[in-house]
């Protein structure tokens, strides 16, 4: 079992990957001409925004706890 301090790098790496995926989806949405596909991409982006926000908050708390 990992300590909180040991988990922080993994959370940071996952957060970077989530942000990169969000950028990819935004770029894909900008090029998409079909409304239905743009809408589906927007829904995915909104879901990712929530995941990114909760992961960021968790990471902040983990860093504070580890100090």
Spans of model-derived segments:
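Short E/K-rich amphipathic alpha-helical oligomerization segments
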Residues: 16-43
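Short, charge/polar-rich alpha-helical segments
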Residues: 1-20
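Amphipathic alpha-helical coiled-coil segments
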Residues: 44-67
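N-terminal regions of proteins, emphasizing targeting and processing segments when present
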Residues: 8, 12, 30, 50, ...
């Amino acid at each position: 079992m990992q300590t909180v301090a040991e988990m922080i790098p993994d959370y940071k790496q996952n957060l970077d990957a989530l942000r990169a995926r969000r950028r990819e989806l935004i770029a894909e949405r900008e090029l998409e001409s079909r409304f239905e596909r743009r809408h589906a991409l927007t829904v995915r982006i909104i879901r990712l925004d929530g995941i990114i926000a909760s992961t960021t908050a968790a990471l902040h708390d983990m860093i504070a706890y580890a100090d």
